[in-house]
Structure formats: C-alpha cells, structure tokens
C-alpha cells in the first residue's frame, strides 16, 4: 500500500473536499473518477474525505466514498480520530450505522484514550452510543448459516439470517416490539424457524461468556431475545399464528392503574433464567429489580434497557406506551396522558387503555386547573411587585397614603369580572373529544 502524506493534495483532491461540504453527490462522483484523486487522501490534519463527510453529516457522500473504496478504519488523524468517531460526534444515526456496516472498529481509541462510543457520550449523542453498543456484525451471524465440523446442515437457514439480524441489532428491547418484529416477517412466524433462531441466540450467548474478552452485555441481550422467542413459540403451535394474543397479554393492564403485570413478570423471569449466575451484570440487575414491588419504579424493562443499550434515563424524551419506541409524539385525544408512535399502536393498546382513560382524563384536567391557578397567582404576585416598586419610588405620596374613598370602585368590579372569565375558560378545558384517537403533541 502506498503511504499517503498529510497535506499533499492535488488540485482535484482539494476540490473534492470542498464539494463534500457544499457540493452534490454527482460532482463528487465526477471528481472521484479522476486519476488525480485518491479516495483516502489526507488533508493537513490527517482527515480523509470520508471523515469530512461523516463529520458534516453527509450520508450520501459517505455511501459514495465507501463504494469507491474509502478506508473506514483509517487512523492517520493527528489526534487519532476515525470516521466512526466523527460520525458519532455529528450525532447522525444513519451515518454511524453505515460506518459500522462498512466494518468500522468500535474499540479503537483516540489520542486521549476514548472510543467512538465514549466520545459520543461525552458530547451527549446518546442515540449514537446506543447504536454502537448494540451493533452486531452480520458476519458473526452468517457463521451459523454454514455447516460446521461434522454438521450436515447449518444451525441457521440462510434465509433467516436477515430477519434475525434485524432483531439482534434493534435498540428497542420492549417485548411487544420484538414480538411485532417477529410477526411482521412471514419467515419467522413458524414454530420450526423460531426454534432454530432461539438456539442460535443461546449459542451466541454462550460464546460471549466463554470468549477471552467476555461480553456480558451482549450475552444478556441474546439471552433476553431468546426468551421472547420461546414465548412466541408457545403461540405458534399447531400451525396457528396467535402472536396478536401474546401482544394483548403483554399489554393488558391491571384494573387499578393499568400497569402491565404480565409484561413485568416476563422480563423478570428472563433475567432470572440467565444461565451464568456469576456474571456481574446479572447480579447488578437482580440487586436493582428484586427489592422493587411490581408496579413501582424502576420497572424491570427500564433497568434492563439501561444496562444493555446504555440509554440514559434522565434524557427528556417520550416513549410509545405500546411498543416502547423512542420519540413518540401522538397523544390520546381523550386523556392526553398516554403517548403512541401512531394510530396502529394506539388501536392495539385501546382494549386495555379504555378502562382507565376516563380516570386519566380527570387527573389531566385537575393538573391543568392547578397549573392555570398557579400561573394566575404568579401573574398577580408580579403585578403586586410592580405596584410596590412604583409606590417606593414616589416617596411623598407613599407617606401621605391613599384613602379608600379615593380608590376607584370599578377596579374591584373589573377584577371580579376577569376572575369569572378565567374560571369560565378553565371549565372549558374539561370538554374533550370522545373516542380512541391520537393527536399531535
């Protein structure tokens, strides 16, 4: 391989770096076809065109450069940054994923000893951290699609590798979401197929625990997904697909507050069944979950998610009540308290939500009334502060004082009128549309 020196750029290579920032993919493609352009050329800081594209959030440029042979693991930057680090710093989830699929190494460190995931966490790009921590190379799964040793058949049929890889790399571990991913792919909705899938997951789990660099986090994730698969198998027996029944069982809430007890028990059971009792992660999970009464915080799902994906609990973001997808923005139009991804999730959850929707609506209206009352009190306090400041500035008038006779009786009448109007507006808040609908937040 020819050694490329930093800063020694041809005119066309300089133009390429400019086009990456401001130009089009077509212009970049034209320049890359030139003999005077090296796809892995280095600027004065040791940055390749791919690093520039990743840092600037240019997804199509990144794909183009990778197709032309860009080195995703180039380590010539003056501070040891890689293309994956720049992608993570930019906060672009798609580019981070593209870099990982192209073979980006996740354990490489920069000059201050930080990996790409650690750099992303440092600047608050938690979504990128989750993607990096949960990435599982397709090659590791493809290993099981070929007969090994004395085996006559592969442990995993090649046609199942794609759908299974999609589930393995998901960052949403909600049991309903996993069942939905199984249900949406006809290849997985067969008892025999899921039997092979869960056995492969168990093999990967075992390998993660017995390898030299033990990976407890990945092992726990594989075991957890395997347990959900085994639950799905119970609803696929005799050639019948009853996964919708399983989803309803996972969502069904108890009468008092709508908490999904069965879902909580399933997650706790899967953690308890982890076969490696000496694992530090298992002991941490048990210590966090065991003392908590079912229905109280933290839930088993939130503890498990934080342990496996590294998602930060204090980030102000909403999650879908049905499938746990991050960034949900639709609210129930009646109670305004429950959030969904879309109407599909809302309709799926309505069978259990309708039992407590009215109670939640009453709670919401009470909160709104209290919030409006506090706001009105703050405004009144603000007016009083302004009036007292004005009186203090006018010392002679303050000393003389103002008699009740000089005060305007109409002021108190107007104050009462404003108060009545405000109360009427608040009563109007109690009117809400009926029926299971979702509204924008």
Swiss-Prot record:
Q: Which residues bind Zn(2+) 2?
A: 332, 335, 353, 357
Q: Which keywords are on file for this protein?
A: ANK repeat, Cell projection, Cilium, Metal-binding, Repeat, Zinc, Zinc-finger
Q: Which domain of life is it from?
A: Eukaryota
Keyword presence, Zinc-finger: yes
SUPFAM superfamilies (alphabetical): Ankyrin repeat, HIT/MYND zinc finger-like
Function description:
May be involved in the trafficking of signaling proteins to the cilia.
Protein name in the entry? Ankyrin repeat and MYND domain-containing protein 2
Look up and give the organism this protein is from.
Answer: Homo sapiens
């Amino acid at each position: 391989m020819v050694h490329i020196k930093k800063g020694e750029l041809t005119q066309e290579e300089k133009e390429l770096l400019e086009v990456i920032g401001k130009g089009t993919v077509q212009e970049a493609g034209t320049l890359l076809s030139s003999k005077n352009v090296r796809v892995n050329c280095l600027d004065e800081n040791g940055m390749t065109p791919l690093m520039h594209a990743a840092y600037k959030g240019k997804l199509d440029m990144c794909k183009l450069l990778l197709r032309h042979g860009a080195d995703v693991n180039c380590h010539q930057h003056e501070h040891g940054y890689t293309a994956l680090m720049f992608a993570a710093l930019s906060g672009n989830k798609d580019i981070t994923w593209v870099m990982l699929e192209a073979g980006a190494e996740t354990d490489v460190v920069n000059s201050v000893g930080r990996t790409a995931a650690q750099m992303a966490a440092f600047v608050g790009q938690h979504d990128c951290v989750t993607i990096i921590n949960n990435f599982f190379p397709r090659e590791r799964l493809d290993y099981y699609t070929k007969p090994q040793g004395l085996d006559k058949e592969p442990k995993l049929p090649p046609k199942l590798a794609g759908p299974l890889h999609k589930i393995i790399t998901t960052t949403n571990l909600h049991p309903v979401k996993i069942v939905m991913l199984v249900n949406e792919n006809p290849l997985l909705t067969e008892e025999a197929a899921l039997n092979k899938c869960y056995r492969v997951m168990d093999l990967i789990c075992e390998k993660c625990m017995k390898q030299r660099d033990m990976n407890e986090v990945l092992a726990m994730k594989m075991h957890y997904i395997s347990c959900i698969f085994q639950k799905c198998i119970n609803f696929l027996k005799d050639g019948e697909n009853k996964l919708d029944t399983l989803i309803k069982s996972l969502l069904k809430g108890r009468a008092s507050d709508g908490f999904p007890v069965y879902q909580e028990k399933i997650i706790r059971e899967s953690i308890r069944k982890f076969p490696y009792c000496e694992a530090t992660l298992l002991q941490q999970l048990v210590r966090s979950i065991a003392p908590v009464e079912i229905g109280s915080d933290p839930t088993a799902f939130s503890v498990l998610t934080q342990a496996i994906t590294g998602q930060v609990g204090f980030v102000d973001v909403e999650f879908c009540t049905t499938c746990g997808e991050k960034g949900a923005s639709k609210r129930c139009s009646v109670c305004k308290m429950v959030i969904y991804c879309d109407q599909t999730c809302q309709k799926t959850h309505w069978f259990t939500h309708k039992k407590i929707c009215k109670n939640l609506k009453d709670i919401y209206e009470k909160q709104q009334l209290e919030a409006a009352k506090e706001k009105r009190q703050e405004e009144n306090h603000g007016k009083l502060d302004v009036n007292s400041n004005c009186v203090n500035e006018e010392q002679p008038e303050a000393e003389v004082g103002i008699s009740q006779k000089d005060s305007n009786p109409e002021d108190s009448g107007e104050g009462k009128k404003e108060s009545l109007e405000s109360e009427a507006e608040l009563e109007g808040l109690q009117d809400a549309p009926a029926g299971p609908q979702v509204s924008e937040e």
